[in-house]
Amino acid sequence: MTDAPVISPIDQARILSEALPHMQRYDEETIVIKYGGHAMGAENDAKAFARDIVLLEQTAVNPVVVHGGGPQIATMLKRLGIKSEFAAGLRITDGATIEIVEMVLAGSINKQLVGYINEAGGKAVGLCGKDGNMVTASKATRTMVDPDSRIEEVVDLGFVGEPEKVDLTLLNQLIGHELIPVLAPLATSATGQTFNVNADTFAGAVAGALKAKRLLLLTDVPGVLDKSKQLIPELSIKDARKLIADGTISGGMIPKVETCIYALEQGVEGVVILDGKVPHAVLLELFTNQGTGTLIHK
């Protein structure tokens, strides 16, 4: 690891001065940040992310953090001798698995991230979509083509949910009051059943309900790539749909982009897919001229 470059006091002042108009743009605005399990990395990376979130709050931005936890769930399931199974990019979640998912997301990752933010000087509040019936969901359904028969079949994903409604009562008590909501992507059904919700989908639903200024999806790739594997810095909804249709956007990037489109259609001003492993990725996107990742807009 190389030492960080030394920045003179004058250059530090210049950087802060150049950030001012960007800070003013997001003054008192709500930014929803999805912090993916793959983006979390080592403890030092998570603590650096937490400090950046506190900095946002200190500059009058209202951050709302939604975290994932796929790798951490997989590690716990493996430790307990439970096989991880996926269909259509979603974890098949049976009765035993949903208990472990809830334990890891709401009990471990959530409280750890809350601790890091509080350690950095913030006031984080750890919640999940079940708290206050914040996010209600219904059972998710997916279809897949059987490779042998070529017949499309419905896949039973178990306790995997799709958000149906977001109740902002609880979040509105926190946002704008120097409190930073940290949300685990769990939801409840109308009958009280716990559902595991894809973190991107959960973040998109929350951002849409809040009419957030920005939704940032932190992942482990630079953003949306073209067929030459070069970053596409900006896309409209129309452009994004074309790239899905022609196969440029494929695999796991499709549901991420579909989440972006949904959030935009619900009133979010802009959505960015960016590499959360880049140091200070959130600050680079919000407070610099060039930004980072792929911005998707109407």
UniProtKB/Swiss-Prot annotation:
<dbReference type="InterPro" id="IPR001048">
    <property type="entry name" value="Asp/Glu/Uridylate_kinase"/>
</dbReference>
<comment type="function">
    <text>Catalyzes the ATP-dependent phosphorylation of N-acetyl-L-glutamate.</text>
</comment>
<dbReference type="GO" id="GO:0042450">
    <property type="term" value="P:arginine biosynthetic process via ornithine"/>
</dbReference>
<comment type="similarity">
    <text>Belongs to the acetylglutamate kinase family. ArgB subfamily.</text>
</comment>
<keyword id="KW-0963">Cytoplasm</keyword>
<dbReference type="InterPro" id="IPR004662">
    <property type="entry name" value="AcgluKinase_fam"/>
</dbReference>
<keyword id="KW-0055">Arginine biosynthesis</keyword>
<keyword id="KW-0418">Kinase</keyword>
<keyword id="KW-0028">Amino-acid biosynthesis</keyword>
<feature type="site" description="Transition state stabilizer">
    <location>
        <position position="34"/>
    </location>
</feature>
<dbReference type="GO" id="GO:0003991">
    <property type="term" value="F:acetylglutamate kinase activity"/>
</dbReference>
<dbReference type="GO" id="GO:0005737">
    <property type="term" value="C:cytoplasm"/>
</dbReference>
<dbReference type="GO" id="GO:0006526">
    <property type="term" value="P:L-arginine biosynthetic process"/>
</dbReference>
<keyword id="KW-0808">Transferase</keyword>
<dbReference type="InterPro" id="IPR036393">
    <property type="entry name" value="AceGlu_kinase-like_sf"/>
</dbReference>
<dbReference type="InterPro" id="IPR041727">
    <property type="entry name" value="NAGK-C"/>
</dbReference>
<feature type="binding site">
    <location>
        <position position="91"/>
    </location>
    <ligand>
        <name>substrate</name>
    </ligand>
</feature>
<dbReference type="InterPro" id="IPR037528">
    <property type="entry name" value="ArgB"/>
</dbReference>
<feature type="site" description="Transition state stabilizer">
    <location>
        <position position="256"/>
    </location>
</feature>
<keyword id="KW-0067">ATP-binding</keyword>
<keyword id="KW-0547">Nucleotide-binding</keyword>
<protein>
    <recommendedName>
        <fullName>Acetylglutamate kinase</fullName>
        <ecNumber>2.7.2.8</ecNumber>
    </recommendedName>
</protein>
<feature type="binding site">
    <location>
        <position position="196"/>
    </location>
    <ligand>
        <name>substrate</name>
    </ligand>
</feature>
<comment type="pathway">
    <text>Amino-acid biosynthesis; L-arginine biosynthesis; N(2)-acetyl-L-ornithine from L-glutamate: step 2/4.</text>
</comment>
<feature type="binding site">
    <location>
        <begin position="69"/>
        <end position="70"/>
    </location>
    <ligand>
        <name>substrate</name>
    </ligand>
</feature>
<dbReference type="GO" id="GO:0005524">
    <property type="term" value="F:ATP binding"/>
</dbReference>
<dbReference type="Pfam" id="PF00696">
    <property type="entry name" value="AA_kinase"/>
</dbReference>
